[in-house]
């Protein structure tokens, strides 16, 4: 599926016939529950500018979603169920995009919750 440009270029390069590569040694299976890459998790925890940038981006996206849903209501149109859903997704306490941005900035690793 997709165009040829969306596929990686390496998949179209073939080795000349007669030169076979040695089979690669498969990686050991990951243990369940173990993080796949420690560097991935460490970056968001230690890089304050990364947290601020991603948090503000999410807060801006949530505000935009709310604003787009609110704009027809300001013009006098009655709200539809989809409009209310957009407003909830934009700024809701539990599942909103803007709230997600606040959590990324304030508590990126979930240290505020006790793990039992």
UniProtKB/Swiss-Prot annotation:
The chain crosses the membrane at residues 52-69, 82-104. Residues 1-39 are annotated as: Disordered. The lineage of its organism: Eukaryota, Metazoa, Chordata, Craniata, Vertebrata. Residues 14-24 have a biased composition (Low complexity). InterPro entries: DMAC1-like_dom, DMAC_Protein. This is Distal membrane-arm assembly complex protein 1. Keywords: Membrane, Mitochondrion, Mitochondrion inner membrane, Transmembrane, Transmembrane helix. One of its GO terms (cellular component) is mitochondrion. The keyword Cell division does not apply. It is a multi-pass membrane protein. It holds the Pfam family DUF4536. Interacts with incompletely assembled mitochondrial NADH:ubiquinone oxidoreductase complex (complex I). Its main location: mitochondrion. Required for the assembly of the mitochondrial NADH:ubiquinone oxidoreductase complex (complex I). Involved in the assembly of the distal region of complex I. It comes from Homo sapiens. One of its GO terms (biological process) is mitochondrial respiratory chain complex I assembly. It is found in: Mitochondrion inner membrane.
